[in-house]
Amino acid sequence: MIGGILAQTLSGQTILGSESLVANFLSPDLWTIVVGLLGGRIGRDSAGDTLAEVDFLPLLLWWSVIAAIGAALAARRIRQRQQTSWGDALMSVGFACGWWWLMGMWELARLSAFVIGWESVEQFLLATPQFFQATALAGWLVQPFAFRCGEQRMESGEQHQNHSATQTSHSALLSILVSRRSALKSVTALIAVYVVTFTAMNWRLWFNLRVPHGDSAMYEEHLWNLWHGQGFRSYLDQGLFLGEHLQVIHLLLLPLHLIWPSHLLLELCESTALALGAIPIFRMTRRSTGSAHAGLLMSAAYLLYFPLHFLDIEIDLKTFRPESFCVPFFLFAFEALELGQLRRTLILLAIALSAKEDYSIIIAPLGVWIAATAWFQKRANPHPLPPGEDGHRPGEGSVAPSDAIPESSAIRVPHTSPLPPGESERGSRRRILTGLCLTVFGVLYLLLATRVVIPWFRGGAELHYVRYFSKFGDTMGEVVWNMLTKPRLLWGELLTVKTVLYALSMLLPVGFVALLSPGRLAVALPLFGILCLNELAADPRHHFHAPLVPVVFWASAIGVSNAGRCVSRLRSCLPLWLHPPTTASQTADSFARQFVWASAFTSGLFLSLSPAGIAFWDVGSPMSLWRLYAHDPRADQFPKVFAKVPREARVASTDFVHPRFTHHERSYDYSHYRRQIAGYEDRVPDDTSFIVIDTRHPYSDVKSPGEVRELQTEPDRWELLPDDTDGYFIVLRRRPSGS
């Protein structure tokens, strides 16, 4: 414990002393407050950089108090659950502080990299203290309980052998039913909390005029224009939206939109859809581990997973993306696949693919995985069980549900009879054929979409997202060819600190347990590689990583059941004197199940924009409650503007008020972006009758009427309406022709 406290103290001095390092945890305002509370001082060095000096003893006292309070609470919990002595309980808790040595290792590695001059390693370490801290805290939180649970489970298993088989079977069945029902209720409650929380955040951003039209509210305009006969488009697009993406999944919301035509509906549906992904995760984990409690913990990890939060609200506050709907459909498809329900799998995959054309880059490798798995299973077991028939994954034997019966004993689920040899042979061939067809389909669909369909809707122009890969060329053909023929350029862009950070951001919040099912996780590798090469956003704070999330949790739901088996295999490979304890497998299983949710929670503390993250409550953070969700006076002034613009008007408006005019006759973007509808010139379309400018939005470059482009270039064509908004908005009306 003492060593862990010292490690946290020494690394804490380094982090709190550097403005760039502490930015991974706190805003400058909160940093100033924390340094002051610790009796430290903030100043500048000779180069003008802001530094802080924090004394060793106050920080040591702070971490000692945290360790003492944590030890007391954990020991009390252990004694209540396991009827052990204070000494044994405190010993378990003391060992848990060994996880804090990770911060000492980070500090030592950072100093070593600096002394040696290994710049890439130093750069990586300077960018990752929050990841090391999240892992250290997660291990500290769950280690005492995992260790004691492993021992208790072994003891309970030994005692259980003295009971009669009939009694065991009856009590086991009853316990399983009660456990599953209770866990499912808890999952439902967690889903409800997520939906309420994120819907409230999204709606508050909308009412505060914080939601942009581009790449967010424009999708509601698609639905409005479609059922008003103006086509599947917004007027940001050069034509129909199919010239941007083969993305039609949000049309599933059209029946609801007919009843409630509002962007708020889309926000509610997106948050609900993302939250519902917890259901297949719960069921897959429960089946793979035999434990409803493990399923509950994995579902909690999913809902705490900070990359999921950024699918609901992106870092640039784009609050609705159709891409998010792929997450639940992929997860339900993976669950159906684990159950051997191929027809249902294909239907769900087709719906997920409608979220974006490049999600075929998930479907093609998934087909390879299905075919390869079926082929290897056929070779290993010529008479396999029916997929999912025994409640477990295809091709695997029965798994002892080691904690389905109040986390205590191991009851083996009986095998069912295998299929007749001919039937199983046909089943294997069918899965191999299905996998190969999926692979071919994925490749052909991507080629057809990107080389034929989308260019046709764009009038032959190149895809807009080719510019995200400008280092490889200016056209899709050049990009692909250079990736294939210039390996040095390709690997030079892939093997970077940025790629490692991206991988850490996806895997660390699930405690790396997804790596315990490497075949499933590999399904995401091709798309992950492409995302690492794009120059726009190579981190999971936008929407590009949406299809990676379901793959990570599919692999985690299955991989979490492999922890004990991995330890057993390791034990068999080691010499006798290096063997871990006999309880190591049970401890590893218990630890993995708890480490997942703890990792999601602690990483979210430093990286999530939700109320589970520090940034939400940090007064100096740009993502804080006080900056984004508190009352905004712009919202009070806007109704005065809206009342001046008739519904039949054709309106050009700035991005953050643009969503309020999408139900007018026409709704155009007012910016310096040159669009087809304005003849690719820096002006509004000719039929624009009103211009509305928000002078106080975050990116406004127009603060007063004298800066308005139209009043400078065409003052005789535009009339400036009287301002009754205290300068928050500028409204122009086109003068009648001839006046």
Regions found by a protein language model. Give the residues of each.
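Start-transfer (signal-anchor) and selected internal transmembrane alpha helices
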Residues: 1-3, 64-69, 77-99, 119-155, ...
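Membrane-lumen/periplasm interface segments of specific transmembrane helices
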Residues: 3-15, 197, 201, 432-516, ...
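Signature aromatic-anchored transmembrane alpha helix within multi-pass, membrane-resident enzymes
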Residues: 92-98, 185-192, 439-443, 563-613
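Hydrophobic/aromatic-rich transmembrane helices and adjacent perimembrane loops
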Residues: 118-136, 361, 521-571
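Perimembrane helix-loop-helix junctions
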Residues: 160, 362-386, 397-411, 424-443
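Extracytosolic helix-loop segments that constitute the early lumenal/periplasmic catalytic or substrate-binding loops
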Residues: 217-241, 248-249
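Transmembrane-helix signature of polytopic, membrane-embedded enzymes
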Residues: 272-309, 327-328, 342-347, 593
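Specific aromatic-rich, kink-prone transmembrane helix
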Residues: 280, 316, 322-348, 373, ...
